[in-house]
């Protein structure tokens, strides 16, 4: 099964929106907590006026959520394109884990996205996030990510790697597996995991994912 990944398939945001997305990325890579970031921080970093942000978004939560999704849509597109150079589904999954291991800064950004969606950010509470509807830019990026994952997992099914046919369950399985691996290598929780080598962690993560799909 052939797949053609083109990052330009994601709608290019207006220049000022792109600058805000880049500003959010830079702030989070600097170890800022989501709750500490203000709209003014974003616009100053982006080099635009504060009022400009509200021409495109209704809140800082909406800016951050869209920025994280757009960032990952682009990174995932490039990552899957690289992974598809491998013919074997398992090797493709390992390729993704290679990337996660080499790009821990993006793992931390994904942690922020996960916490926002799970409602775990509590200092201060970010209740407005749950009320945010997908914006034009973030929603298109979200749809693109879903399409990429669907095609990636369908190829695994065609290869006979698993038997699950439900696309939602496939998507949940691969995302859960990669989040699990990212947490293990990023947080470095301590002695409990020191008995496992990176090879053992990858094998365990992959094996558990396949079991959940059979």
Please give the residue ranges for each predicted region:
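Amphipathic alpha-helical packing segments from all-alpha helical-bundle domains
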Residues: 76, 80-81, 120-159, 168-173
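Basic, helix-initiating cap at the start of DNA-binding domains
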Residues: 1-45
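Amphipathic alpha-helical segments used for helix-helix packing
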Residues: 103-132, 183-188
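Helix-turn-helix
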Residues: 33-66
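Solvent-exposed, amphipathic alpha-helical segments
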Residues: 19, 23-31, 78-82, 177-185
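Hydrophobic alpha-helical connector segments
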Residues: 66, 80-110, 171-172
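Short, basic, alpha-helical segments at the C-terminal edge of helix-turn-helix-like DNA-binding modules
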Residues: 39, 68-77
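Hydrophobic/aromatic-rich alpha-helical bundle segments in the mid-to-C-terminal region
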Residues: 157-205
